[in-house]
């Protein structure tokens, strides 16, 4: 894999502080003995290395509050062996483990916990190795989507990958939750295109696909992050792309009635377009007008794109100058608002400094005009709110609902995301913003999926509930308690995920408030595979 310059802490500072902060337990000596030297310890000093690196990958300032729990230490492994040894050393104590890839967990679950915890930050595991002959790549899970896209574009103009468009999202968490993006109508989710993986389990065993078994390999590709162990790397299938694709990003400022009409028609066009096309919408409003930004993507030349939208959606009023031809890599930089492809390789870009909260729905039936009108009406009363709309269809409808844990395939029409964001100066209105979002979500209830109301684990939402794993009474009924959100995210795949969790992590070492629970009273406490700490050589 390509070598990148890792980020290091001062070992001497860590040695002195950890002994004081952690009471002379075994963690320091264990890490040192096993060659894990890149780490720092909790400090209340805002200028310390600890706080600088803690906040470096926090993508939602909502979780930078001084009242939010902080890890006892941050460890940055630089290899799969260091990652394995880190897990083994942490398990000698009583800490909860948190794994952070890009820091985009919508609920901050990759870097917060209600119990004392150690943060394993994967940012130094960000190498990408491209094999053009097999058209595959090994991607370390600390790589961001932008780093992955950049590595692909540097190697080939005819290959790409299907995943999200935000370049600072980590591949570890994104693929673990499925990974929807602008190419999903053509090639499915990111997780649909994973052909192997390396997982470090709770015992520190290093497992490839064969060693972990097909049930666990199935589970890690869409069953949510931070649940099964630590993903060291994904082996992905690279996908054919033309040398030129067509994109557009056009904003229309219109009255609410016209916006309602456009969105009502958009939902049919977005789902029914050929799979070579994607048309998504971002939107917001104020008291005077609605703004709708149309994001279009086509696997081909702009002449075909223009003739298609002229025929199917003339109301957009697109002109030839709106359609831009560029390479696949350039298109993802453009859609992310970047000026150059090389900027994709910068994992520390900050696109928005506002705190935010988001909720999501998936629809099975077309939304009526009154749903769009009511949604826009509510947006007009909250300028800090906005929406993101994505159509499914295409290849998404052809993949079986149990191919991976992500079940929202045939029959799923739209994914509708509701967001509210605010600046630090508006922090006093936080409760007001969250109340507005909850009322929008409640308003949409009659129009979206039911029994259960569907969600997407990469848009994890603790409003749906959570488990206090320290409460033994609750834990004994965890499978039924977790069912409400488990079936919302995974439908009937929830049951298979429970079985996979019981196989790979029966002691529930890797957990968070909405993680998949293992079966209680399992026949053995430590799974046979890797229980002696032995490694499977990859």
Curated annotation (Swiss-Prot):
Binds 1 FAD per subunit in a bicovalent manner. Its EC number is 1.21.3.3. It is an enzyme of class 1 (oxidoreductase). Disulfide bonds join 30-89. Residues 1-23 form the signal peptide. Glycans are attached at residues 38, 423, 471. GO terms for cellular component: cytoplasmic vesicle. GO terms for biological process: alkaloid metabolic process. There is a cross-link at residues 104-166 (6-(S-cysteinyl)-8alpha-(pros-histidyl)-FAD (His-Cys)). Residues 67-241 form the FAD-binding PCMH-type domain. Its main location: cytoplasm. GO terms for molecular function: FAD binding; reticuline oxidase activity. It is found in: Cytoplasmic vesicle. It catalyses: (S)-reticuline + O2 = (S)-scoulerine + H2O2 + H(+). The FAD cofactor is bound via a bicovalent 6-S-cysteinyl, 8alpha-N1-histidyl FAD linkage. Keywords: Alkaloid metabolism, Cytoplasmic vesicle, Disulfide bond, FAD, Flavoprotein, Glycoprotein, Oxidoreductase, Signal. Its cofactor is FAD; a metal cation. Pathway: Alkaloid biosynthesis; (S)-scoulerine biosynthesis; (S)-scoulerine from (S)-reticuline: step 1/1. It comes from the Eukaryota. Essential to the formation of benzophenanthridine alkaloids in the response of plants to pathogenic attack. Catalyzes the stereospecific conversion of the N-methyl moiety of (S)-reticuline into the berberine bridge carbon of (S)-scoulerine. Belongs to the oxygen-dependent FAD-linked oxidoreductase family. This is Reticuline oxidase. The lineage of its organism: Eukaryota, Viridiplantae, Streptophyta, Embryophyta, Tracheophyta. The gene is BBE1.
